[in-house]
Regions:
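Catalytic alpha/beta active-site cores
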Residues: 1-167, 172-173, 191, 200-204, ...
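Flexible loop/turn segments at secondary-structure boundaries
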Residues: 1-3, 77-84, 120-127, 150, ...
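Flexible, glycine-rich loop/tail regions that form catalytic "lids" or insertion modules at the edges
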Residues: 261-264, 268-434
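Conserved helix-loop functional segments at active or binding sites
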Residues: 103-110, 146-154, 186-194, 227, ...
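Alpha-helical structural elements
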Residues: 13, 23, 179, 323-324, ...
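Active-site capping/gating regions of soluble enzymes
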Residues: 98, 134-143, 162-342
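Context-gated lysine
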Residues: 13-15, 21, 29, 50, ...
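Catalytic cores of large soluble enzymes that bind and process phosphate-bearing ligands
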Residues: 1-2, 31-35, 48, 85-96, ...
């Protein structure tokens, strides 16, 4: 737009779309973040295809899709097993994931992960490190089998898969990444004949929120630091360190800065961290790696005996195991068999009472009203497009066409709620097995 001096055309489109109809233009609230020039705000309330010639827009779109980086989390199996934020039927959700991956392959979207196969939520729900790793990897292999059944090539999609694990303080967490990589690489190479890039498992670590306690909350930074060292020494690809007050409230500016400082101090001040994978070759790390791998393979056998991941889900196997392990941990915590400093042992003179938050960050009434008005504007401006767009989306679902292609279009003028309810009618809502 700037190269071809089309700013006046954009302004005219905004006038026709909003001013003439008496609708307030959407605005960006707040200061522009440092390092951003705000150029993208030029099209706030419009899409590029309303301004640019169709061929130019398509060329720019393809170029953007080829270079854009990011991650879609959308891992439906862990939702059923642990996270509980399922809205569509499992079958329809898998289909949406397959359509997304197929779209990525067709449009050569190589730098965006199509799914973050997540163990973090499984661990936070109560699973021990072995179950977290076994369930997560088995979910990953289930996606692989499903995508292969749809005719996709392993080398086209395996590079778009990433993983997400939790790190606690148990010794198994010290090797969770290297065990995952070992099992994944073996399977990709020996079972699926995948190329070298597909054999490389990329994973993100977030330190364990479940390991943070509402008593003596300043001690939580120590726990997070130790978990961060586990992750870094295990060669994670990326790392998130939790704020110490997340046990009682949404993080504050001060606690977030401290959480970031944990990583910065390790990276810039800790000498050993300058050496990649410093613990490799030690007896305990090698022994742990073999033991954890063996334990994960045994859990794979138990899942296989129950008909694979989907078969095990039908009887609630994963959920039941997670609940049992959660109860076991809580029992050890409350009896004191598992010593937790400042929680059940080494208490302060006043008994280390539960800390109550000084502030709880919530959306203000003004922020809520702003969002409501934004949605109203969206519906008013696009009232002539919404019904036809949603109908076309439903027809694509019934005709077994690629739904992500349609979502890329209908997402320009329909709200998330409108799209969701339209898909409920053709894909079914989630119902948990009892």
């Amino acid at each position: 737009i700037t190269e071809n001096q089309l700013e006046n055309l954009v302004e005219q489109k905004l006038k026709d779309t909003y001013d003439v109809k008496g609708i307030e233009r959407p605005t960006y609230k707040g200061d522009i973040p440092e390092g951003n020039n705000g150029l993208g705000l030029m099209l706030l309330g419009l899409t590029g295809d309303k301004v640019l010639p169709a061929d130019v827009y398509e060329e720019i779109k393809e170029r953007a899709l080829n270079s854009v980086r990011g991650t879609v989390q959308a891992d439906i199996l862990k939702e059923d097993q642990a996270q509980n934020t399922c809205i569509f039927s499992t079958e329809f959700s898998l289909r949406l994931m397959g359509d997304l991956q197929s779209y990525f392959i067709d449009h050569k979207i190589n730098n965006f992960y199509s799914v973050s196969i997540s163990g973090y939520h499984i661990a936070e729900a109560g699973a021990n490190p072995i179950s977290q790793l076994a369930f997560t990897l088995s979910n990953g292999f289930t996606y692989v089998e499903y995508y292969l059944s749809r005719g996709m090539d392993i080398n086209d999609f395996a590079k778009n898969l990433s993983f997400f694990f939790s790190n606690g303080v148990d010794p198994e967490y010290a090797v969770i990444g290297r065990v995952a990589r070992r099992i994944w690489a073996k399977a990709m190479k020996l079972k699926y004949g995948a190329d070298e890039r597909a054999q490389k498992l990329k994973y993100h670590i977030q330190t364990s929120g479940r390991s943070l306690h509402a008593q003596e909350i300043s001690f939580n930074d120590i726990r997070t630091t130790l978990q961060a060292l586990y992750a870094i020494y295990d060669n994670c690809n990326s790392l998130h360190t939790n704020a110490y007050d997340e046990a009682i409230t949404t993080p504050t500016e001060e606690s977030v800065r401290r959480a970031m400082a944990i990583q910065l101090i390790i990276n810039h001040e800790l000498g050993l961290a300058k050496n990649e994978n410093p613990t490799q070759g030690s007896f305990i790390i090698e022994e742990l790696t073999d033991l954890v791998e063996e334990a994960v393979m045994l859990e794979f056998d138990r899942i296989t005996e129950r008909g694979g991941v989907l078969g095990a889900m039908e009887t609630g196997y994963q959920r039941g195991k997670i609940q049992d392990e959660s109860l076991y941990y809580e029992t050890l915590k409350h009896t004191g068999e598992l010593p937790l400093i400042g929680v059940n042992t080494f208490l302060s003179d006043d008994g280390s009472p539960t800390v109550l938050p000084k502030e709880v960050i919530r959306a203000t009434e003004a922020e809520k009203e702003f969002q409501i008005n934004t949605l109203k504007q969206l519906n008013e401006v696009n009232s002539h497009l919404i019904e036809d767009g949603l109908k076309k989306l439903q027809e694509a679902a019934i005709a077994n066409k690629n739904l992500f292609h349609e979502l890329m279009e209908v997402g320009k003028y329909c709200s998330l709620g409108q799209i969701t309810h339209a898909l409920f009618e053709v894909g079914g809502q989630y119902r948990r097995n009892m």
